[in-house]
């Protein structure tokens, strides 16, 4: 889902974050710029990022408000925005985030399961440009598929947990 979304809108990077209690944690991260620099077998360093769900950071803002954000330049946010761009992830990964579209992953009841974040749309010359309205529609379409995948994963996980719990109650003498 993330790969196809990025391909359709021609974005360099992206992530899927999942809500875990009061935090939002990156589950899938892709970055074509960094992928080219990795040695064989080496993985991207994004799996360690986790943020509190609040309106101070972009992912937390989208997860807490349920509103998508289309940001032209993360380093040039107006002073009056309630959220800020966390430069630490760029510093830690030696990357330069500019344009970003962040979309909430909501189920049918409106519960936020996670966030889809697409980063650095590229033009035909490889320059970073802003995401447009058409990109927003495409990303929203793929977000629906991401929600379905997350819901399926949650249901499967819950079913396995129930089966394990039921197995604990089984009397081994009965078999």
Where do the model's predicted regions map?
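Amphipathic alpha-helical regulatory segments at dimerization interfaces
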Residues: 2-8, 61, 65, 90-91, ...
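Histidine- and acidic-residue-rich, metal-dependent catalytic cores
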Residues: 159-175
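GAF sensory/regulatory domain recognition
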Residues: 3, 14-55, 76-77
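Short amphipathic alpha-helical segments
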Residues: 2-7, 13, 59, 160-164
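Signal-transducing coupling segments at domain and membrane junctions
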Residues: 58, 67-68, 72-99, 121-129
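A short, aliphatic-rich beta-strand micro-motif
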Residues: 98-107, 114
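Signal-transmission/dimerization alpha-helices at domain junctions
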Residues: 61-68, 115, 137-156, 169
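Regulatory loop-to-helix N-cap segments in sensory/regulatory domains
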Residues: 96, 111-113, 119-142, 149
